[in-house]
């Protein structure tokens, strides 16, 4: 073999060996940098899981493989120990570890029966009985509304499991009509089957991951399909987390805008001042006033409000209302005369209907 061909062959061999050892690029699969936080990894998985789910891509022969790669990437990068091993040794360093079902990972975010693509509730077959839905209020802070968050909820869920023997049931949904009198009828379900497998309800602990999206509004609901009350003859209902934004001690939310009040001294109101307001994510909003600030004056800081739920790139305003703290102690006659001389302002005593703007 010529030296040049031998060199090319060796380089190709080294490349193939490196590829085998390295395995799949989990960061590339999730579309995140190697410095990505756990929050970024969860957001990326949640977004891609909806796009790549095989049920949503029935015509793609590689859909199942892509979905499995996505689940494997999330399982490793969301676990600090596995991620450390992967960063050091590649996928080969994880071969001896336990791997979760990718369906389990998906249900961790969306529920047992997956996410209803298109955002519409699942269509219920009227012939299949269904357990009750459960609605749970989930309290979130204004800080979480601003920046988003992932909240883990541990739920003890009764699950129908097979039990020995048979049971009587109404799986065929047959009805009996009984006439009670003229124009009065009663319909009852008829138990016509005694051959169905027996079932029992067993409590199982499940950990669900609720994504608090930036800009989420009070009263919005996050559904987890099949995580509601079970039904021994059918399918379980749904679990819905209803967002309840708790009050904040500094900011008040109105739509995408934030409101707050700032109290300044009389001296600051007259001569000006500078100050910083600590925002919900810790960054500072600088305020500088070099003119007179009257009680009730408002200052708009555009882009310093909450992110819009539908488009996080758009943010509302921060509206600051100023209050003036007047001195508590009484002024001396000399001080009063000094103020009169300084301000050179005569009496202004006007009586009017302020509510009408006159």
Curated annotation (Swiss-Prot):
Entry GO CC: cytoplasm; endoplasmic reticulum chaperone complex; endoplasmic reticulum lumen; extracellular space; nucleus; protein folding chaperone complex
Domain J: 25-90
Post-translational modification, as annotated: Contains high-mannose Endo H-sensitive carbohydrates.
Gene Ontology biological process terms in this record: mRNA modification; negative regulation of neurogenesis; protein folding; protein maturation
Principal localisation: endoplasmic reticulum
Annotated positions of the Phosphothreonine modification: 188
Gene3D superfamilies linked to this entry: DnaJ domain (1.10.287.110), Urease metallochaperone UreE, N-terminal domain (2.60.260.20)
Glycosylation sites: 261
UniProt keyword terms in alphabetical order: Chaperone, Disulfide bond, Endoplasmic reticulum, Glycoprotein, Phosphoprotein, Signal
Leader peptide range in chain numbering: 1-22
SUPFAM superfamilies associated with the record: Chaperone J-domain, HSP40/DnaJ peptide-binding domain
Subunit composition and interactions: Part of a large chaperone multiprotein complex comprising DNAJB11, HSP90B1, HSPA5, HYOU, PDIA2, PDIA4, PDIA6, PPIB, SDF2L1, UGGT1 and very small amounts of ERP29, but not, or at very low levels, CALR nor CANX. Binds to denatured substrates in an ATP-independent manner. Interacts via the J domain with HSPA5 in an ATP-dependent manner.
Record function comment: As a co-chaperone for HSPA5 it is required for proper folding, trafficking or degradation of proteins. Binds directly to both unfolded proteins that are substrates for ERAD and nascent unfolded peptide chains, but dissociates from the HSPA5-unfolded protein complex before folding is completed. May help recruiting HSPA5 and other chaperones to the substrate. Stimulates HSPA5 ATPase activity. It is necessary for maturation and correct trafficking of PKD1.
Name recorded for this polypeptide: DnaJ homolog subfamily B member 11
UniProt organism field: Mus musculus (Mouse)
This protein's encoding gene: Dnajb11
């Amino acid at each position: 073999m010529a030296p040049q061909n031998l060199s090319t062959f060796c380089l190709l061999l080294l490349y193939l060996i490196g590829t085998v050892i390295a395995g799949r690029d989990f960061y590339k699969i999730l579309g995140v940098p190697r410095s990505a936080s756990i929050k970024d990894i969860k957001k990326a998985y949640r977004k891609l899981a909806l796009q790549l789910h095989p049920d949503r891509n029935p015509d793609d022969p590689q859909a199942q493989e892509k979905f499995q790669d996505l689940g494997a990437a999330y399982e490793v990068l969301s676990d600090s120990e596995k991620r450390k091993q992967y960063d050091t040794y590649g996928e080969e360093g994880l071969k001896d570890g336990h791997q979760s079902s990718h369906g389990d990972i998906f249900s961790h975010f969306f529920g047992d029966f997956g996410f209803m693509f298109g955002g519409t509730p699942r269509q219920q077959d009227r012939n299949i009985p269904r357990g009750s839905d459960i609605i749970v209020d989930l309290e979130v802070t204004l800080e979480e509304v601003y920046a988003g968050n992932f909240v883990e909820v541990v739920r003890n869920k009764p699950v129908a499991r097979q039990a020995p023997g048979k049971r009587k049931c109404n799986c065929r949904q047959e009805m009996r009509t009984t006439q009670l009198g003229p124009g009065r009828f009663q319909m009852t379900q008829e138990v016509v089957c005694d051959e169905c497998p027996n079932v029992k309800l067993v409590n199982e602990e499940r950990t669900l991951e609720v994504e608090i999206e930036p800009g989420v509004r009070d009263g919005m609901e996050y559904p987890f399909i099949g995580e509601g009350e079970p039904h021994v003859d059918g399918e379980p209902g749904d679990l819905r987390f209803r967002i309840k934004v708790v009050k904040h001690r500094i900011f008040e939310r109105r739509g995408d805008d934030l409101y707050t009040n700032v109290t300044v001294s009389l001296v600051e109101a007259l001569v000006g001042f500078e100050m910083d307001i600590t925002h919900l994510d810790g960054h500072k909003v600088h305020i500088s006033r070099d003119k007179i600030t009257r009680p009730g004056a408002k200052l708009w800081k555009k882009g310093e409000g909450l992110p819009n739920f539908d488009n996080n790139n758009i943010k509302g305003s921060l509206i600051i209302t100023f209050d003036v703290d007047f001195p508590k102690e009484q002024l001396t006659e000399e001080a009063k005369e000094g103020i009169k001389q300084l301000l050179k302002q005569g009496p202004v005593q006007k009586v009017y209907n302020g509510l009408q703007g006159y």
